[in-house]
Amino acid sequence: VNDMKAIIDREFDNFNALKENTYGQKIVLTYQAKLNDRAAADTGRPGFENDVRLEFSNNPDHDSEGSTGYTPWDTVVCFTYKLNVYKTNNHDFKLEGAKFRMYSDESCKNEVYVKKTESGYNVINRDSTGGTDHTGGTAPAEAVEMVSDKDGNFIIYGLDGGTYYLKETEAPAGYRKLLDPIVLKVVPTFTT
């Protein structure tokens, strides 16, 4: 390219309030990745690495023609967490059949949807339901309530760091459900 400034002036006319283009600025690209169910269930690892690099054209006047270049590889490490939940009475007797839903807000309006898997319950990514993270969107068809097993236990996989509210929706026969949600804080600690 003989004159990059001429191309920028042509493509981005009057870029700022002074009708000038600013050269030499950094271009920042952001990407997002989603963990699948296998990754969500594989907690305890030192994190999941996502590698990315960008291929770009060296000739801005032509689409998909000519030589290309690459940015250096960039790596982002993400983490996921699991939670073991035990439902017992005040004498530590294990209670089967207690039903729960989890929320990301204290008023218990933004549900953290989960689906049943062989080993427990996996968090469903809200991006797939029309929301972002743990807010908004519609309930996916596979979303279920969490139910304690014969040992009073269930496991939630794929949690992000943050505060959650576990609300009992139905108590086992002969018991009353909890009056208030249980506040759960997932606070990651990283070592370097």
Task: Provide a role label for each language-model segment.
Residues 1-192:
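Solvent-exposed loop/turn and edge beta-strand elements of beta-rich ligand-binding domains
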